[in-house]
Amino acid sequence: DIEAPEGRRWSSSWVRELLAAGDVAGAARVLGHLHRIRGTVCHGFKRGRTLGFPTANLSEDVEGVIPADGVYAGWVVRAVPGTQSAEFLPAAISVGTNPQFNGEQRTVEAHVLGRSDLNLYGERIAVTFVSRIRPMLSFGSLDGLLTQMDDDLRQTASVLGIGVTGRVDPDSVTAR
């Protein structure tokens, strides 16, 4: 048996336990690489777009273990059309039921930082998790949610080591 420095045996059960707790960084240490899920981008409720944070929503055909509800820093990985190359796009990833909007269905949505021009509908993408930013929360107001989302983007940029980006276009918020 191979044991980790903590004395625990490396196992897929350990990885699933870490993911269930939202510890994607711990899962990456056990796996030896970042945890990734795959799915097809589908149409959602377009709430993110109306708030100035367009998202790529994964359909229910997700491959891989979805981590605990929360907001994560990570990457959207897509095939570059017409090539054999992959494009890694920095992303703030939301996993959960969207309690702010009384959501019932658990979803995975990724907002690509600094990009509002992407049309990923129908594409099969990978979502790679680097670090958990925070648990899923409900806020008292739309402004509270928007302020937190801006902070989530800044934290995501910091974790990923890229330039700080705020909301795509604050004037585009149509949900007020």
Q: What is each residue range found by the language model?
A:
Residues 1-30:
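Contiguous mid-protein beta-loop-alpha structural module that forms a pocket-lining wall or clamp
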Residues 9, 16, 36, 47-49, ...:
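Basic side chains
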Residues 26-31, 37, 42:
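Charge-rich, low-complexity N-terminal segments
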Residues 34-35, 153:
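Residue-level detector of secondary-structure transition/capping positions
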